[in-house]
């Protein structure tokens, strides 16, 4: 009788493990909250033309929010939400994760091939870190990502966006266009910092920006993107009259939104796209 009870307990435990592996587990509590992109890393050994630049302002500063009900973000172009997310653990080192999901690498790879080094990320020296993918009600989060040569999983590929937690405040996120993002958790008391002194805010739009962590982050991104455009124009000897005029016209257009947050956000997104298109020569 005692042996039968033990057998049933073992069987039940095995069932729970299998079910968790198939269905996933709730989001880890450590993940819940808002995270902000602090760094945008590219493969420094790749010669291909990329959509994004190193620390691209369209991605740097963006916010990812993780809750038990939904994962959302305000990253450029791909705001895809993940409803009712479940986490699926991945048992691998950061190097292995990158080899199995990013393009441009063979898998298995020679020992001297190190995408962690190529992307200039802090190396975990082969240690296993906590990593997982997310499943949503509509399928895998960012499920179109992954190696194009992973037919029938021959390369043990990891599709979709994956998360690797370096610690409880820092994560690596595999993102679009073979980009790696470094995010930090946003403290609940994080100060709001715009590109201008909020004490000198004079319009309703500026006051709205200074009252929103998200809008202030976009404001900083636009200021950085504009600075890059000016530097590029100076370096190439291009006239800056049009660039300066366009920025002034945009500020006027932005301020026409008043305190309407969605209007301001839309105006900021468009300006970021315009500045990026200009820097790419299109």
Region spans (language model):
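N-terminal alpha-helical modules
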Residues: 25, 40, 60, 79-81, ...
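Tryptophan-anchored aromatic micro-motifs
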Residues: 27-51
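Short hydrophobic/aromatic-rich beta-strand segments that constitute the beta-sheet cores
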Residues: 37, 71-75, 170-174
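Residue-level recognition of beta-strand termini and adjacent short loop/turns
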Residues: 158-160, 166-169, 177
């Amino acid at each position: 009788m005692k042996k039968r009870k033990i057998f049933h307990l073992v069987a039940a435990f095995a069932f729970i493990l299998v079910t968790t592996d198939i269905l996933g587990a709730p989001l880890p509590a450590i993940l819940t909250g808002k995270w902000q992109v602090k760094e945008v890393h590219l493969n420094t050994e790749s010669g291909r033309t990329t959509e994004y630049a190193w620390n691209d302002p369209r991605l740097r500063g963006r916010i990812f929010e993780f809750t038990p009900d939904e994962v959302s973000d305000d990253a450029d172009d791909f705001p895809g939400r993940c409803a009712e997310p479940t986490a699926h653990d991945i048992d691998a080192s950061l190097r292995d994760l990158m080899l199995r999901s990013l393009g441009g690498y063979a898998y298995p790879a020679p020992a001297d091939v190190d995408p962690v080094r190529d992307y200039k990320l802090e190396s975990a020296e082969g240690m296993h870190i906590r990593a997982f993918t997310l499943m949503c009600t509509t399928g895998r989060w960012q499920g179109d990502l992954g190696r194009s040569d992973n037919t029938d999983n021959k390369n043990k590929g990891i599709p979709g966006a994956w998360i690797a937690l370096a610690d409880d405040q820092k994560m690596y996120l595999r993102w679009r266009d073979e980009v790696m993002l470094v995010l930090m958790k946003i403290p609940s008391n994080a100060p709001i910092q715009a590109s201008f002194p909020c004490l000198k805010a004079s319009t309703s739009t500026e006051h709205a920006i200074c009252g929103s962590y998200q809008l202030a982050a976009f404001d900083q991104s636009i200021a950085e993107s504009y600075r890059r455009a000016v530097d590029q124009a100076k370096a190439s000897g291009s006239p800056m009259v049009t660039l300066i005029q366009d920025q002034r016209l945009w500020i006027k257009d932005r301020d026409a939104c008043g305190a309407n947050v969605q209007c301001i956000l839309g105006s900021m997104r468009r300006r970021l796209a315009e500045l990026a298109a200009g820097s790419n020569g299109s």
